[in-house]
Structure formats: structure tokens, C-alpha cells
Amino acid sequence: TNSQINSYQEILEDLTNTFPMKRLLQGDVGSGKTVVAAIAVYAVVKSGFQVAFMAPTEVLAEQHLKSISEFLKYSDIDIYFLSSSVKDRDNVMESISTGKPGLYIGTHALIQEKVLFSNLGLVIIDEQQRFGVDQRKKLITDSDIVPDQLVMTATPIPRTTALSIYGDLDISSINELPPGRKEIISYLFNGLKGDSNLVFDKCKEHLNQNSQIFVVCPYIDESENSDIQAAEI
């Protein structure tokens, strides 16, 4: 889309500057933020540097691993995955410490004390609002050089609000959906037990249309302190 093109052009221009990039990339789920990030990854790794891509959960990190691996499958870029459950963790750690150029995708495992990047050119943080300030800074401050920073969020943030909260970041927005991508419709229920049938009816309606549905609940188990419906119920 045009907004994707504008976004990656802004990022590539930042990467050529003599000072580090600090940019926020925002766009709805499905708007194509990951492919824009993949373009930045390609540019930085082909320049001989490492890229650290941190996501808040292992599930989300694995999704990025799958998506970016598909985008870059015809390139010669090495892609590594680091989490607490990775079997070849020692090999990944060695590649990190020796400065081997490549993309390193992971969770909080990327900011553990033993993880020391020696050739870090770009840090990408997805859903950055789910990380603490100290966690976000750790990747940058532990590096031998000051890397470029790209943070991504699917949370809609008005530009004036974004400037007040992230005043030190330039902002790129993807406000168009790729061709063929359906608009995502959100429904909000009070969460009381009486809403269950309404939720189930809405799920049946979309399942009959062969649609995907995400149901988000505030609790996994029932809480004694609240009458809100739990996910397991």
C-alpha cells in the first residue's frame, strides 16, 4: 500500500543518517507492519550488522519468525530464534557474541545478562508498550555501538497523543489495509456471565462465514473478586 511504501522509505532514509534512528511504526493488525520491518532487517543485515527483534510473548515471536522467514526466503540472511525453550541456544548465543550478521528474533531472552550483542545495528521491538522502560533500554545500552531503533504497535494512537508520550520518536503510520484484507471488526461485551450467549451467537455467525475469531477475556480462571466471565468457562 502507499502508506507501507511511505513508511519503509522513511525508515530507509533514517538508516542512512549519521545519527541513530528512533522511530515508531503504528498500524492496525493486518496492515502490513511486519513486511516493512523485514525491509529494514534486509537493509541492515546486508550492511554487515546484527538485528535484534524482540516480541513480548513466545507465540508472537514465533509468528514473526515464520512471517519474516517467508519474506526473506530468497535472501541469504541468517535468521535465529532465541527463547527459554530453544534447543540450540548455545549456538545462537555464540553467533550473537561473535557479532555474526543476521536477524535474531526472541522474547525477553534477548535481554538476559548472558546475551551480549557485539555488532548490533538495529533493534526492533513489537508491541513496545508491553515492555518496561528499562527492558527497552537494555538492548540499546548493552550494545558496543548505539543501534537504530524501530518500535511497532497495533494500538491506535492519535498523533498528538503519540507525540506527547513518545516525543523522542519519529512516527510512521500505516493507515491502509493491503488489497484483499478484510476490515477487522471488534465487539465489546461487559463481561458479565449473562453475555455468554451473545458471545457464542456472534462466534457462530462468523464461523458460518468461514471467518477467524479472537475472543479476549480478562481472566483465565474464575475470580472470587469479580463476576466477570473467565476464559475457561
Model-predicted segments: where are they?
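Inter-lobe coupling/hinge segments of SF2-like helicase ATPases
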Residues: 1, 9, 16-233
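Short, conserved phosphate/pyrophosphate- and ester-handling motifs at nucleotide-, phospho-/glycolipid
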Residues: 4
